[in-house]
């Protein structure tokens, strides 16, 4: 073999090895995935994962998020509300919890129009309430009704996703709306609404969880460590720079005014912490409540979930 042939062969082997080493990380996000949206915009996660040979593909979901969680087509998933995470467990989806956003109880609420005769949860009896089925807001509604001595049978729940719920609330076809930020903040600052209950009333903590496919988590703990650290640092940055974060997020959230984004972010903790089984009592309470309300098909033991723990 000539020197030229040796050089060519070596080049081909190097190219093949490089191509083999290059891997794709698929990440899903939704409108409420503040930290993912910022990382997609600033490219910081890609920079940190590049030495490991990873490129990142981002996938936005407005609907069908549960299907994507179950299908395994995404490696790291949009952060989901506490209640929503239970549906993945009920579906036996092979997912690993690798991070948690600490409690943000004020980030969702039950609201009515300012002129409404409804002034308390008890006044919801016989009324129509818009809520996203199976969401964290759904649990807030059930908890609020229970505290007032009512059940879902005492109202007419109208199960609508956030955009449709907003339309129904605006045109008066529902009496109340159970909603989360930034939709909640938009209603407060751009419309005449009143809050009749939120999580600060001791009804729900509203945690959020970050999930990975278990196969990916087992194969790439180094990627999870970098992702966890980057999410935590991004959350700290948002809280330390509220106005700057709002000005970045506003256009990315559909041209929401910075003041609205800032109001919404003020109610989110963005405190990224490890998931610990001993701290999931509220998850078990939600699971039991949802099984009793026939929102999930079977009883769940939340301690059965798979958890990945980051290095300190």
Model-predicted regions and their roles:
Residues 46-51, 201, 270-279:
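Short, solvent-exposed loop/beta-turn-alpha elements that line the ligand-binding surface or hinge
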